[in-house]
């Protein structure tokens, strides 16, 4: 007997904004979404700041969004958790950090601090680096090297020079630390097994090898700008040849978001890594959060706080079936993050991964793999095998990050077409479809001065309920899971403090 599906469609990076200037969502031709807004109950959801467990005014992101959606409650995020520990002093006694620094003194080795130099708050925060530098000084360390990854994606594309300047000044102020290497996140923070990029980052940090050498970090960034290269894409630069990562050194990776921290970490800690040829050697390595439960030879400074009875676990315990489907760029979000940071696949949970296209930047192929994701999802819906389907279309976010307006418009139009097909298939099976987003992006493609805007936004996101409910209230992402359970006639578990969006 065929199941009646409840399908949740997450349009990654699709926010709501009334102004049309630089708004790829408004500029796009979206006949299907226009139809759904016209025909079905809809509302707006908060996807940023305190409503998703971030500091007030902090833009949302995909990890946080999917975590809150899957949990059915507001989940306190790593950024405020770590920042609070700095404020109350616990940070400076963190056992993992203490061990890494003490190991340097015992072995007379160097401490390396690596991570994204940014205050965008998505993957890292520069204040956490500065706290580690202060801690290193307090513990009497002298050889402290910084491997700076430049952002340009969650913040302005040419803001890197400011962060590098601040870091150089902080080194001077404390009398501790030197920038050994700097590079765009394009190289150091890949998540799609583009090992040529990761190898370039590794070679710079471990071997001190790169075509670019400049002992002046600020000048190195300015040189890149002069050549037309923005922060994200700056090729690795060697700033201090003595600052290579060597045997028995300690490394602290201060990024707290796992997905883009895994690959470069594995090159340094996993003897079985085979993405490219390199020599393994022992280091004391600290991941600020748990990047991967299978990661060997690491300590974790801030272990993940368990999310009990999230939507996936709850459905599984009830004996219901569920499908998670996305392309590579967002696969971790509909699985790992949606499940509250649990690597385990729950009984009754199937997963479909569609490879993302191998292009340098997604403005070159704004359709990405959406059509294949759509076709595979429709096929699974028509199979009648699933009670719940969780689907992510990556386009609006990934193409939005490029800052290329016309490509973002095409991305929105692609998503519109695919969402229409998935909703049609769901309704044909007698099911209910929900359309939403995890955060904003494509609705704001330009900054006030007209330059490209590549970061997320704090805008509200849509929620459309196709096939049930005549009136919806405003809410937040944590209310989606209770709404799914509501339309399925199921009580929400007591751990979920989100509330159904349906007005009774």
Model-derived segments and their meaning:
Residues 1-504:
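Feature captures the catalytic ectodomains and active-site-proximal regions of enzymes
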């Amino acid at each position: 007997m065929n199941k009646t599906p409840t399908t949740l469609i997450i349009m990654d990076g699709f926010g709501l904004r009334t102004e049309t200037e630089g708004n790829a969502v408004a500029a796009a031709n979206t006949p299907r979404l226009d139809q759904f807004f016209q025909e079905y109950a809809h509302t707006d959801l908060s996807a940023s700041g305190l409503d998703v467990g971030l500091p007030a005014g902090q833009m949302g992101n995909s990890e946080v969004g999917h975590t809150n959606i899957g949990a059915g409650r507001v989940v306190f995020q790593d950024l405020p958790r770590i920042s609070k520990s700095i404020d109350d002093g616990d940070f400076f006694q963190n056992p993992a950090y203490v061990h890494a620094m003490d190991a340097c003194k015992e072995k007379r080795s160097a401490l390396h601090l690596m991570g994204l130099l940014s205050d965008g708050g998505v993957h890292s925060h520069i204040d956490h680096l500065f706290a580690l530098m202060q801690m290193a000084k307090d513990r009497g360390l002298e050889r402290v090297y910084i491997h700076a990854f430049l952002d340009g994606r969650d913040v302005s594309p040419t803001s890197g020079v400011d962060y590098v300047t601040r870091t150089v000044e902080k080194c001077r102020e404390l009398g501790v630390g030197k920038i050994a290497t700097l590079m765009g996140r394009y190289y150091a923070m890949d998540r799609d097994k583009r090992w040529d990029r990761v190898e370039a980052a590794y070679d710079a940090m471990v071997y001190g090898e790169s075509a670019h050498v400049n002992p002046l970090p600020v000048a190195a960034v300015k040189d890149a700008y002069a050549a037309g290269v923005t922060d994200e894409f700056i090729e690795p630069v060697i700033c201090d040849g003595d600052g290579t990562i060597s045997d028995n050194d300690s490394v602290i990776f201060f990024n707290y978001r796992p997905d883009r921290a895994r690959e470069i970490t594995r090159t340094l800690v996993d003897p079985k890594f085979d993405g490219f040829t390199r020599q393994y050697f022992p280091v004391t390595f600290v991941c600020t959060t748990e990047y991967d439960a299978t990661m060997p030879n690491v300590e974790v400074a801030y272990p993940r706080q368990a999310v009990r009875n999230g939507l996936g676990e709850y459905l599984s315990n009830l004996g219901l079936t569920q499908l998670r489907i996305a392309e590579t760029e967002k696969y971790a979000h509909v699985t790992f993050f949606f499940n509250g940071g649990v690597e385990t696949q729950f009984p009754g949970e199937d997963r479909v991964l569609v490879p993302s296209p191998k292009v340098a930047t997604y403005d070159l192929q704004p359709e990405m793999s959406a059509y294949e994701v759509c076709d595979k999802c429709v096929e699974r819906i028509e199979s009648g095998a699933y009670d719940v389907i969780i689907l992510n279309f990556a386009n609006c976010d990934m193409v939005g990050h490029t800052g290329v307006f016309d490509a973002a418009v095409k991305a929105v139009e692609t998503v519109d077409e695919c969402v229409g097909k998935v909703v049609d298939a769901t309704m044909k099976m007698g099911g209910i479809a929900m359309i939403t987003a995890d955060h904003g992006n494509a609705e704001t493609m330009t900054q006030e001065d007209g330059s490209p805007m590549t970061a997320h936004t704090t805008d509200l996101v849509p929620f459309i309920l196709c096939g049930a409910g005549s009136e919806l209230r405003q809410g937040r992402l944590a209310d989606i899971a209770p709404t799914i359970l509501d339309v399925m006639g199921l009580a929400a578990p007591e751990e979920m403090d989100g509330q159904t969006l349906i007005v009774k």
